Amino acid sequence: MMESVIRLENFYFAYNKSELVLQDIDLEIKKGSFTVVAGPSGAGKTTLCKAMTGIVPFYMGGRYSGDVQVLGESTKGRRVSDIAMRVGLMLEDYESQLVSLTAGEEVAFSLLNHGFAPEEVAERTRKALEDVGLPGRESYQLDELSGGQRQRLLLAATLAVHPEIIVLDEPVSAMDPDGAHSLYELLYAIHQRYGTTIIVVEHRVDYLLPYVCLLYTSPSPRDM
């Protein structure tokens, strides 16, 4: 039996002075699975992604009850930066996560912040860009890349840290159907090659049917 890497138990969450965004969530993600979470707009899927990485509630604030466990430990009292070394996150608003001028600097940013040696940073950056189909783009300015390429760049920055889990919130929102299929083929190849646990929030489930192990759907907002 596969072990759990993420578990939400009786989890409720509301942003400050707002109604409940997540209500009575019980969810278990197995190690090495490729899991899809689907549901309508307003169902709390983005907030769920943030809860899986400790951003909600411990970075953004809000009211909550219940528990979230990541890799066998509760997120309570853990630093978001420590969780980020093991759980990568790509949000739908990917532009807000891009912080550098060039593709190489973007991939290297979190590695340098975590104290990796320059030689290892350079090698991980090269390999991550190659893995996402952007080989040799280290010196490219971000404004030279298309929206889809910038989403691939953010995936490269996530992969470079070698996370055990990757959580992706609508990662193909800036892509045409061909680009979306290509990115999900890439994600599945990474999942197969490295055994990475993949969790994708996506309203177009048809993109993912060839790859998914587990599918969770939400019929109405906040009823996850």
Q: Model-predicted segments: where are they?
A:
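H-loop/switch region of ABC-family ATPase nucleotide-binding domains
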Residues: 202-203
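Conserved ABC ATPase "signature" region
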Residues: 119-137
